[in-house]
Amino acid sequence: DVETGLKYVNNDACYPAIMVIGQLVDAILEGRYDPDHTALAITQTGGMCRATNYFGLIRKALVDAGYPQIPVIAISTQGIEDNPGFKATPALLHRVIKALIIGDLLMKCLYRVRPYEVTPGSANKLYKTWDTIVRETLEHHGHSKTAKRFIGKGYLPYPPLFRQIVTSFDALPLRNIPRTLRVGVVGEILVSYQPDANNHVVDVIESHDCEAV
């Protein structure tokens, strides 16, 4: 991601911007999405940092990478850019907010149990299962084939989905040991959460038998 970002973004841009744009362009270059049926969306705050300039940087990167047909949507209340053909409806914004909250829940559950798991890899496996279920429920208005196979319920509206995630992680077999030292990860928001950007600092913390928070 960093190498792709440096290739398509001038290196006077900040590190988080290079990382994010590299990720987005990489996803297209690797063939994970059809460039003729894909749009990229990014927030635009109206401030002076990358949060306003992402729009132009991403558009230029896509053109330079050979994908000028991919539209870039600026999600903003400032009205700096026009987004013809796109309308942020209340229903869409509601789904976006749900995705943000559930993503935070999944991360917190994973970090809380992974240092104590009985079977190595079991927490990551459970996380990936619920990540798939969440994606399906958001795309199909609460319905999930994976959830049907995993917990016997094919329909999970928002509140039950939350409860099922917590219940599932609570049931994961853990070692009967005292809670380990907790280490807080702080700093620039993107670098704090993106493993490649922070050199997998959470893995380093957990490798020293500590719990990342």
Residue ranges and their predicted role:
Residues D1-V213:
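An N-terminal assembly and electron-transfer interface module characteristic of large anaerobic redox
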